[in-house]
Every structure is written in structure tokens, then in C-alpha cells.
Amino acid sequence: MLRYLFEKIMLILDNYSQKKNFSFLRNLIGKKVEIFFDVGFHEGETTSLANKYFSIKEIHAFEPNPDIPKKFYKRKNNNIFLVNKGVGRKDCKKTFFTNNFSPINSFFRVNKRSKHTRLKIKILSFIYSEKINSRRNNVEIVTLKNYCLKKKY
């Protein structure tokens, strides 16, 4: 329960700053958007917010975490196309580290020697009774350029 609450608080704080960004963008480009790319879809927080601020024809949501699509497909979103890949500078395969605390999933291995990471681990250890574990996943990376060329955009 504490874990769930902590994750939700983190998302609320993130959404607060995202709302300011989306408000600024809407004033700059207007409400209608043809294509929106959500790189790092996670559980759709940014996409949900974007759908509230804009009238979006298509959302292409990239998420390399193999566990996320299972959750996503339970929702009904007819303008969202989930791409179970990461985005990078070149098409390749790369190691993606997933954790039991999903907001810290990353392509970068956790540097347990850094002061920042040690502080994070202390905070998370206080909140979670379980140890933060990483799992390696070999995932596909695509460039946005190549993705768009395949889709003929």
C-alpha cells in the first residue's frame, strides 16, 4: 500500500510540471495535433495528459518495458499505437533495466556508488520492505526517423 501511494505521489508531482509544459505548448501551437510521440510511455501518464490538452489524431507511444503492454491493452484508446521498443540514435538491441519500482527503469545500470543513488536507495528502502531489484531485458531500439519512414510519414 505504501509503495502504491509513493508511486502515485511521484506521478502527481511529475504531472504538475507536465501540465505547465502542455499549457505552454497549446498556447504556442494550438489545440489540434496530427501526431504525438510519447517516448518512455511507462503507464501512459504523459499520453493521458496530452489527450486532455490537445485534440490528437494519432499518438505513437514507445515503451521498451516488456511488462507495460500487458497493462496497456486492458485500456481502450483508439488513437494510441503502443510500440514495444525504445528510441535511440540508431536501430539496434540494447539492455533495458527494469526494477520492482518502475519509475526508475532505465537503459542505464544503477550506479550504487553515487551519492544520489545511495540517497534514493535509502528513501526507497524506507518506503519498501523489499530490496530494489533490477532485471535485464534485451530490447529493440528504433530511430524516430526510421520509424516514420516505415509508417510513411
Sequence positions of predicted segments:
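Phosphate/nucleotide-binding beta-alpha loop and adjacent structural elements of enzyme active sites
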Residues: 1-153
